[in-house]
Regions:
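N-terminal and secondary-structure boundary signal
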Residues: 1-131
């Protein structure tokens, strides 16, 4: 279904990046919605800790919030930056950014399906799929 629609076959270990929802926020697509897609690609739900305060900013509390929001009921979950140090990828010819820090667990995957959204924060930054 999804692989036919995209025209791409996701191979090997597949990471599925979602926005799992902040505490008290209902503005995220529920795990039940993503369940058939994740099953089709045999994926693992992946997330990263946030750079701003809240339950998603620490490895100790982030998994608990994902459980509260129902993610662990349906999926294996990998918090990609739960163990450090980050992997540093160079950005050749980058105008502003010269390198990108990514969670170490990203190296455990062969493919990634990004189901997270992109957004501009009122704090003057960007978030969602971009982080």
């Amino acid at each position: 279904m999804i692989t036919l629609s995209l025209g791409v076959k996701l191979s090997g270990a597949v990471a599925v990046k979602v926005h799992s929802g902040e505490k008290g926020n209902q503005n995220f697509l529920r795990p039940e919605f993503w369940r058939p897609i994740v099953a089709e690609v045999h994926g693992t739900i992946v997330e990263t800790n946030t750079a701003y305060g809240g339950m998603r900013d620490r490895t100790e509390t982030h998994p608990r919030l994902m459980k509260e929001h129902g993610w662990s009921q349906y999926f294996d979950i990998d918090l990609m930056d739960s163990e450090g140090p980050d992997v540093i990828w160079p950005i050749p010819n980058g105008k502003v950014l010269k390198e990108n820090h990514v969670g170490r667990h990203l190296m455990n995957y062969d493919s990634m399906l990004v189901l997270a959204h992109f957004k501009g924060h009122p704090m003057g930054g960007y978030g969602g799929a971009i982080k």
